[in-house]
Structures are given as C-alpha cells and as structure tokens.
Amino acid sequence: SDLAFGHLAYEVDDIYALCAHLQAQGVTINRPPRDGRMAFVRTPDNISVELLQHGDALPVAEPWASMPNTGKW
C-alpha cells in the first residue's frame, strides 16, 4: 500500500541560524520564520519539512520578518 503524509516536523534550537545555514546551502525557505517560531522548507526529494523553534519563539527579526513565502509547503 502507498503511505502518504503531509510533512515532517523537527524542533530546533535556533530557527534563524538553521534557516540561514540551509539557505546558504541552496535550500529554498518556502515559509520563512517570520514569527520566530515556525518555518517550512522543501527537500530536494520534494518533501515538506516544518521547523519549529524549541521553547519560546525568538524575537521577530530581519531578514525573516519581511521575507515573502516561496512556492508551497
């Protein structure tokens, strides 16, 4: 049977640092962490991955706060 799922999710220690690292490696940030709490990226295998800030959201910061969504997640 075919298994289907919407996305994977990971809790991370510093969502801004991880998103910056992934972006530097050429990963598209589909939904930037504008709120300091949540982001979505898409893997080269077309899997949507949700990143969640561990604990409280980080303070809202640029460049993330004004970055638009890219594609879909």
Regions found by a protein language model. Give the residues of each.
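Short hydrophobic/aromatic beta-strand micro-patches
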Residues: 9-11, 42
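Vicinal oxygen chelate
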Residues: 16-73
